[in-house]
Amino acid sequence: MKARWLGFVSIALLALVSCSTVDPVTGKRVQNMYLIQDDIQMGREVIADTVATMRKEGVRINKDAEQVAKLQTMVRRITAVSHMPDLPYQVTLFETNIVNAFAAPGGQMGVFTGLYHPEMGLVKDDDELAAVIAHEVAHVTCRHTTEALTRGMPLQLVLLGASIYAEAKGKQDLAMGLAAGFLVYQGLVLPKFSRADESEADSVGLMYMAKAGYDPNAAIRIWERAAARGKDPKLFAMFSSHPTDSARASALRKLLPKAMAEYERARDNSSRP
């Protein structure tokens, strides 16, 4: 049984190592065992589960025509200049004071109304809202979720295989503990983007918003404002795994000349008859 278990893990890990693909944004080879269609299906399931969970908590879907139209227009403009313009992008607006936005694989995104307010919000104008949307679109096009799932697969396989082996040997307590560890790891570690993922989404998103005709200075304003607010608990959900706000503003400022050139080019093109 031990030999069989080791064989199972070895074969699975070998398959994982061989699942190299080309990153659609950087052009580099990366490990991702999922197809684009997997991303799309996973994203639909994630947004459906999120909507169901939110409704149980009393959070409704905001269907205000003006607000929804604004978001949809931003998504169309930004995704049109992205590396994956043909994905079935969709944005859902949740009516809640939570300060957050998120991206699921395959083009699904969620925005919480607590993020945007002209006076009190972290995001105060359309350019700043576009910066958030572009950041989330970048997570989608960089395929950060399924890359993270792939990176976490070796430990998942070890935990799962060890659980199967322990159960076969009659060690039920150990099997249950390992199975619980597998579920905790799968549910609590994998969905979070790494700081490297967040930094990449910042830089890619900055170029997306600029190419779409939104002022890239807005992205820097957001992180400077967040840094000034310090450890506001309302912001914790959005930034718990992100680089520090001041570091993000500094990194984006270095990219600003290139982004401004794209922004001016987009404005020139839009003004032509």
Predicted segments, located by residue:
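A Zn2+-metalloprotease active-site environment signal
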Residues: 19-273
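Sec-dependent bacterial lipoprotein signal peptides
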Residues: 1-19
